[in-house]
Amino acid sequence: MKPVLPLQFLVVFCLALQLVPGSPKQRVLKYILEPPPCISAPENCTHLCTMQEDCEKGFQCCSSFCGIVCSSETFQKRNRIKHKGSEVIMPAN
């Protein structure tokens, strides 16, 4: 085995690690600390939460346009309205 081969492997390995932004610890902490996006539009943006235990039964702590709030766990069906040249998605009532 040539002595150049391990050196080439080491250089490629170091360059590949630089392409990945952030450390694995930061990515894991971000996933744990930030709640998932809401699956339905929040009914009330005043019920803020920091943990799942802050929400009542049937609600989940999630991230929405108005912050981290308690939102319904059920998926909200949306109606599709077609217009000329575009499509608009509206919440179902």
Swiss-Prot record:
Location, primary (coarse class): secreted
Molecular function terms from GO: serine-type endopeptidase inhibitor activity
GO cellular component: extracellular space
Subcellular localization(s) per the UniProt record: Secreted
This protein's UniProt keywords: Disulfide bond, Protease inhibitor, Secreted, Serine protease inhibitor, Signal
Purpose: Putative acid-stable proteinase inhibitor.
Residues spanning the signal sequence: 1-22
Keyword Disulfide bond tagged: yes
Domain WAP: 24-73
Disulfide bonds: C45-C66, C49-C61, C55-C70
Entry protein name: WAP four-disulfide core domain protein 13
Organism the protein comes from: Homo sapiens (Human)
GO biological process: antibacterial humoral response; innate immune response
